[in-house]
Amino acid sequence: MFVVGKGCKRFNSNAMKDYLIPVTNTTKISVGLIWLFHISGLFGILFIDRELFLETTPINLFVTFIMLFVNQPQMDKGVGFAAGFAFIVGFAVEFLGVNYGLIFGEYAYGNNLGLKVGGVPLLIGANWVMLTFITGAVAAIFFNTSAIKAAAFGAFLMVLIDLVIEPVAPKFDFWEFADVTAPLSNYIGWFLVAFPIQWVYQTQVKLKDRVFSFHLVLVQFFFFGAFSLIQLAS
């Protein structure tokens, strides 16, 4: 048992199993599928057909997006508002970044994230929603009495996920910065944009999915972390 700080839930480490072990059949199937998708994707990209598996990325993202909402404990106006806010703000800042080099730096999207509008894949808006919801749900496990602290921690988790993805994004033809390596402004921009989106999520979504979100966060670090380590070792 440990206490993280004021405004933070008194967290029993033995209760971690509550967030790792799915209870309902829907969650069991969903968690099994996301691990299956990413483990098979890892081996498929490495050992079978790199291009074929990377081209299925939009399908993977879309199916995962649907599963995220299937696993929400409650679908109400708060969930809809938080999702819409994350999509619109996320897509808007990406549009500014791609077309004007603002916020994140100068970069362009590749071809493996599907249909683009104004140079930005539509699925990127959905990806902002997914990242907001899953990191926000995990943040709320630790900071369940302070929306501000939960929003800050959720935004920090989003930056960490981006940090893990950035080294492999160009090789996967997801996106690439003008200077190849993502600048510091990218990570600062991510936090500054993610924080208000996270705050909306924390204040609007009253009942948060824990298990599916926890596993999806783990999957992101596992999948992209593995490729980043392989790239560093090569």
Please place each PLM-identified region on the residue numbering.
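Aromatic-rich, lipid-facing transmembrane alpha helices and their immediate juxtamembrane interface loops
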Residues: 2-234
